[in-house]
């Protein structure tokens, strides 16, 4: 009986889809130390630099379902591994 129970537990663990959750940096500073666990469907980390005026950059980092659109005076980098948007 114990063997059957143990077998059922092992099969249940193996068959469960534990899933994978992506972790991305999420803060507006140049040097970032805050992390965000991405929601279901968000499979991309991004870093967006926006030049507001000469010598003034705004950093935006986070999770996304798709790579954000690049607009004038923006630079966007996308990646798909943990904490890759440094």
Curated annotation (Swiss-Prot):
Residues 1-21 form the signal peptide. Gene3D superfamilies: CD59. PROSITE patterns: SNAKE_TOXIN. Expressed by the venom gland. One of its GO terms (molecular function) is acetylcholine receptor inhibitor activity. The keyword Acyltransferase does not apply. The keyword Signal applies. Disulfide bonds join 24-45, 27-32, 38-63, 67-78, 79-84. It is found in: Secreted. Keywords: Acetylcholine receptor inhibiting toxin, Disulfide bond, Ion channel impairing toxin, Neurotoxin, Postsynaptic neurotoxin, Secreted, Signal, Toxin. One of its GO terms (cellular component) is extracellular region. Binds with low affinity to muscular (alpha-1-beta-1-delta-epsilon/CHRNA1-CHRNB1-CHRND-CHRNE) and very low affinity to neuronal (alpha-7/CHRNA7) nicotinic acetylcholine receptor (nAChR). Belongs to the three-finger toxin family. Ancestral subfamily. Orphan group II sub-subfamily. This is Probable weak neurotoxin NNAM2. It comes from Naja atra.
């Amino acid at each position: 009986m114990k063997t059957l129970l143990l077998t059922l537990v092992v099969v249940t663990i193996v068959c469960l889809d534990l899933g994978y959750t992506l972790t991305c940096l999420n803060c507006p500073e140049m040097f970032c130390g805050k992390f965000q666990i991405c929601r279901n469907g968000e499979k991309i980390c991004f870093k967006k630099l926006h030049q507001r005026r000469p010598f003034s950059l705004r950093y935006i980092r986070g999770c996304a379902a798709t790579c954000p659109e690049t607009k004038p005076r923006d630079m966007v980098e996308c990646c798909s591994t943990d904490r890759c948007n440094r």
